[in-house]
Regions:
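Terminal amphipathic alpha-helical/low-complexity segments used for targeting or macromolecular assembly
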Residues: 1-57, 161-173
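Left-handed beta-helix
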Residues: 56, 62, 67-68, 73-82, ...
Length: 173
């Protein structure tokens, strides 16, 4: 404990947790955040981000606009276009693709749950408190508080918005 405090205290403790994390999704999120802005660990973070991206097949660019409270449920086969904007408290699952061919990426609101196997295509706006069911293909804008599913995704109801978002990161506006 004394050695940790001598080498930077809390930062070293957090790094120790990130390096030895049994949950690779947490480790990936940690190094993604550190690789997004210049800091004393920037080059180590870039390397770790690259290494974990290759190992788990996750492609999330550190330059992407990403809100607080990102939760990666099962971190494999995730591809997100670097121009995508993701709001606060977004939960993403495995086999997710958010892509574009015409440089018009998606904008995802706050408190959004994206289920496994979802494809979000082109210039769509996803509102706040939206739940997207497994295997959905989103090709149109989604309103706030909607639960959607299907190919193409259709609004099923407006009951219980954001019900799968737990442990929200409190953001002071």
């Amino acid at each position: 404990m004394v050695e940790m405090n001598a080498w930077g205290g809390k930062l070293v403790k957090i790094l120790t947790v990130a390096l030895s994390a049994k949950n690779h999704c947490f480790a990936y999120s940690f190094w993604l955040r550190l690789a997004s802005k210049p800091n004393p660990l920037y080059y180590v973070a870039k390397w770790m981000h690259y290494r974990l991206s290759r190992k788990y097949g996750i492609q999330i660019s550190p330059s992407m606009k990403l809100g607080y409270g990102l939760y990666i449920g099962h971190g494999v086969a995730i591809v997100i276009n670097s121009g995508t904007i993701i709001g606060n408290n977004c939960n993403i699952s495995q086999c997710l693709t958010i892509g574009t061919n015409h440089n018009t990426p998606a904008v995802i609101g706050d408190n959004v749950y994206i289920g496994p196997g979802v494809c979000i295509v082109e210039d769509v706006r996803i509102g706040n408190n939206v739940t997207i069911g497994a295997g959905s293909v989103v090709v149109k804008d989604l309103p706030d508080n909607a639960t959607v599913a299907g190919v193409p995704a259709k609004v099923l109801n407006y009951n219980n918005p954001g019900r799968y978002i737990t442990n929200k990161y409190c953001v002071n506006s």
